[in-house]
Amino acid sequence: MSKMDKLAKFEKFDLFFAAIACICGILKVMEMGKEGYPTLGTVSKNGMAVLAVLVALGFLLKYADQMCRRITSHSFSEKGGFLNPCVILSVIEFFMMLICIKAMLFYPAEIPGVDDSSQMEPPISSKFGLFGAIFMPYIFAECIRLLLANKNSRRDRVILGILVLGCLAMAGLAYLEYKGKGNFISAGILGVGLSMLLSRLALVDEDEEDTLLDDSAEGGNVWMYLAMFASFTLVLILLARSHRILFDNLSFLDSLKSFTFLGRKVSQMASEDPPKDPLPRQEGGGGDTIA
């Protein structure tokens, strides 16, 4: 099997699961918008959980294949080696993928708040939306790649259409979560996805020739590095902000541990350990108590 055949195999894998993600996401939005469909909610939730594992495996295989092809290329050293923007981009994509998988699997769904009768703020919701975790690394990879290789094929337009559907589904989920729970994290991730989508739209041209990743980018182009750095920084700011909200009741060291895949116990501590009561309990009868 040639390298072209292997690459096409990975591309079909990504397209297939991206399409399923859109369908499951739309089902989830429908279930959230119309209460009384527990079966639909169960199907969408379980389907997206299984899909998350498959997508993660697909990303791992894809990036491993890309890195192997670049490192073993005869022109690897001539194009800057590990300082080549495309190689740096692959490392950033891999890092972002791990962070998104970590957020999707290990972050607690909610942090317990005070009782509603206390008229305090409602529980802080930390749901990113499974589609945000699934689509964000894919949008990041595809759109920033276009900043490095100014070539687009018919396949790229198909991917662009899937990204549009994914962003529309993310928009529905983000709106419902913000309206019902005041959750701005999903809206922030949606903003990242839309900004990347606009970058991709600005780079679409009429070239329909199927091409591989363009590794011929010159290492001296400062704009390439600035584009990668700006996008990477924007995503990290959103993740850091949401992480601060989730683990506000933990020590600094425990918060650092929670960033790793070994920090699942720390994440569970954040979701199981309720915050201190803002008001003292009233002992004896004749008054309401804060649970």
UniProtKB/Swiss-Prot annotation:
Keyword Membrane: yes
Membrane topology annotation: Multi-pass membrane protein
Glycan attachment points: N249
Chain ranges passing through the membrane: 13-33, 40-60, 81-101, 128-148, 158-178, 220-240
GO CC terms, sorted: membrane
Major site of localization recorded for this protein: membrane
Protein's name according to its UniProt entry: Uncharacterized membrane protein ECU08_0540
